Structures are given as C-alpha cells and as structure tokens.
C-alpha cells in the first residue's frame, strides 16, 4: 500500500540554510527516496495561498528539487501584525494559524508531521481530532526565548521574549495530550519529559547531507561563523562574536548566512578585520567553510552539536564551540571555550596551527558511526507507521 504523509513547515525547506529548514529538506528527500508520498504545507511572507505540483503553478521561491520530489506543495501567508496577539498562544505560533490549512489537512487521512513549535497550535483544531499528529522539535522553544530574553538589552524586548517563553511552554503542555513528539537526542527527550511529566516522545538523530570528511590539511585563511542569520538567536550569537571576541582580536573573521539584518551588516564592517557575506550560494558557502582556518559555532541553546557545527567538522579545519555542548560523540572533533576570553585564547593557539591528517582520521572514525539518511528515514517510518 502506498504510504503518504502531510508535512507542515513554518518556512520553505532549503538545503543551504543550516537549521530547521535544512532538516525538513533532508527528511523530505529521504522519505521521497523511500517511495513515500510527501504533501508539503509551508509558509512564506506576503504570499497568497497557492498550490505547486508537477502540473501546477511553480512558486519561484521554492527549490526546484522540492517541486520534483513532493507529491504536492501548498504555501500559505505568514500572519503579521497586532492581530496575532493572544493571551494564550505565543506570537511565534499565532503567525502560522490558518483556517485554510486546517481545511486542507482535513481532506485526507494521512499522518501529519509538524516541523517545530511554530505551526503546532493547529493540532488543537477540532477538525483534526481524529488525525495522528507528530511534532518534531529540534529546538526547545521556551529555552530559545529564554536565551533571547537574556541577550536582549531593551526592556520591551526582554518583556516580549519572556512572554513568548511562558506562552510557548503552556502551548507545548496543552498539545501534549494530542500529539506525539520527535526530538534529536536523549537529553532533549529528558527536557520534554520533565516539562510534561510524561508524554509519547521518540528520538531521531539529525539528518545529514553526507557521511564523509572533506576537510583539508594545512592552514586556512580566516575564522568563520555561519548560520541562518534571519533567526534571532543566530543573529545575537553573531553580534556576541563581533562585540566580545573579535572586538580586540585582530584576526580575520567572516560571518556568512541568509538575510542578515542591516544592523548586523553595519556592525560586521565597522572593523577592518571583520566582514559579512550575505546569502551565499551553496557552492560559495561550502568554499568558505573549506578555506577557513577555524570554524566558530557557539551553541547557547542546544545541548549537542548543531547542523552548522557538524558541517564544520565534515568540511572545515579546527572547530570551536562553547562548553554547554557536552556528552557528544563528536567531542574529539572540536575545541570548547566557556567564555569570550576562552574563545580568544583558543583562536590564538589554533590560528597558525596547521590542520593535520591525524585529525582528519579521527573525524573519519567518528563520522563512520553516523547513521545514513536512509537508515534515519527507516527509523522515522517505523515511528509513524510501526
């Protein structure tokens, strides 16, 4: 019997944007390669609700491969403005509430996978009462907003992020009885269990674009930080590196990623040794990783290595993250610093230290234990269909 699944993503899946959009792209690719029909429901700003299929209208912002492999793609507008304000739902979730999406999902009997907290409030709709729904959380939203609250200086922003943290926790608790969860690690599972005092929670490791090491030996040319710069937390991490690490460390530092804010662009070009490369193509981004001497990927929210750090391990030379990344099998592949000054000390030690063949061999042995996307797809299918 032909298997089909509805996947809901708050953003258009993209292989060139580390984070949720990238993970959604790879899980769709794995499912389609396994012969499973994927019906993708996604959001974009200032868009009318349109459907894109092999025979239908092609959304120019959608990756051509998605149009080729998905059974259907339907996009909806992201809600903006004060009308999204609610005393019970965080703004981050209210902007994805859409009655037409609920009606479209009610038309079939396929299981539903919601990617991230954003669109998850639709699980409360009475029209979807009889649906089997899973929510895959790659980031624990209350912790995410708590980090933004801590890093924000403006009182109103602090209050806003505090409110988002409280409401997102309430929302996750509210839908816990309605959905099943998928998280990337045992530590993430423990976090949810402590919040929900139970719940149906499965673990599924992060998908990846390759299981090979292409790192080059010798010396690179600069330090690099990369990520989804449109994301508030990634933006603040980039600002932290500029203002706390490279403000008085005159080592070449490059930031790259999609849609950086004008303020970040201005800050990155204030010093002669720092710069930003906005919206690189996939080949350009890979080239920057391969030519870097040090990959910097602090992780202030997630417990384990994120997608950008894993890319650095597989394609780059020396990698540095912070001390919150603990208990990881990838630990031999990176250095850890607990503070800005610790980052500076490690950078000074490594910047003129050639990357060796021995270090590459260590990474190859560790990466060899990774599960392939094919194996992860099989695990996912077992979670959904048993």
Residue ranges of predicted features:
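Helix-loop-beta element that forms the nucleotide-linked donor phosphate-binding surface
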Residues: 125-131, 173-208
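Acceptor-binding helix/loop patch of EC 2.4 sugar-transfer enzymes
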Residues: 78-91, 131-167
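A charged, aromatic-enriched C-terminal amphipathic alpha-helix characteristic of glycosyltransferases
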Residues: 96, 354-385
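Acidic donor-binding loop of glycosyltransferase active sites
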Residues: 290-304, 317
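N-terminal subdomain of nucleotide-sugar transferases
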Residues: 1-70, 247
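Membrane-proximal helix-turn-helix segments that form the acceptor-binding/catalytic region
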Residues: 26, 100-106, 141, 152-181
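Conserved catalytic-core segment of nucleotide-activated headgroup transferases in glycan assembly
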Residues: 203-270, 276-283, 290
């Amino acid at each position: 019997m032909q298997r089909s699944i509805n996947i809901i993503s708050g953003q258009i899946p993209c292989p060139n944007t580390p984070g949720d959009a990238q993970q959604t792209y790879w899980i769709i690719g794995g499912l389609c390669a396994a012969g499973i029909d994927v019906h993708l429901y996604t959001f974009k700003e200032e868009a009318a609700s349109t459907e894109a299929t092999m025979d239908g209208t092609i959304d120019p912002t959608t990756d051509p491969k998605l149009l080729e492999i998905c059974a259907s793609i339907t996009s909806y507008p992201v809600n903006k403005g004060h009308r999204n304000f609610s005393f019970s739902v965080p703004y981050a979730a209210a902007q994805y509430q859409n009655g037409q999406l609920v009606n479209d999902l009610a038309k079939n009997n396929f299981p539903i996978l919601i990617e991230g907290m954003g669109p998850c409030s639709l699980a409360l709709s009475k029209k979807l009462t009889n649906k089997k729904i899973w929510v895959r959380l790659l980031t624990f939203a209350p912790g995410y907003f708590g980090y933004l609250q801590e890093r924000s200086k403006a009182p109103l922003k602090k209050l806003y992020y505090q409110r988002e943290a409280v409401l997102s926790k309430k929302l996750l608790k509210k839908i816990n009885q309605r959905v099943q969860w998928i998280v990337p690690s045992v530590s993430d599972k423990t976090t949810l269990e402590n919040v929900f005092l139970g719940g149906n929670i499965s673990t599924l490791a992060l998908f990846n674009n390759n299981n090979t090491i292409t790192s080059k030996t010798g010396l690179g040319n600069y330090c690099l930080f990369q990520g989804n710069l449109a994301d508030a937390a990634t933006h603040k991490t980039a600002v932290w590196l500029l203002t706390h690490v490279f403000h008085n460390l005159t080592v070449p530092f490059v930031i790259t990623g999609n849609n950086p804010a004008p303020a970040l662009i201005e800050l990155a070009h204030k010093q002669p040794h720092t710069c930003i490369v906005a919206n690189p193509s996939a080949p350009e981004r890979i080239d920057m990783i391969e030519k870097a001497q040090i990959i910097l990927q602090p992780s202030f929210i997630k417990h384990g290595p994120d997608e950008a750090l894993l890319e650095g391990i597989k394609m780059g030379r020396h990698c540095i993250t912070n001390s919150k990344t603990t208990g990881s099998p990838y630990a031999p592949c990176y250095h850890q610093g607990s503070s800005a000054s610790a980052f500076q000390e490690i950078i000074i030690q490594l910047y003129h230290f050639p990357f060796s063949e021995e270090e590459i061999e260590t990474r190859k042995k560790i990466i060899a234990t990774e599960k392939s996307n094919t194996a992860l797809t099989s695990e996912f299918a077992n979670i959904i269909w048993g």
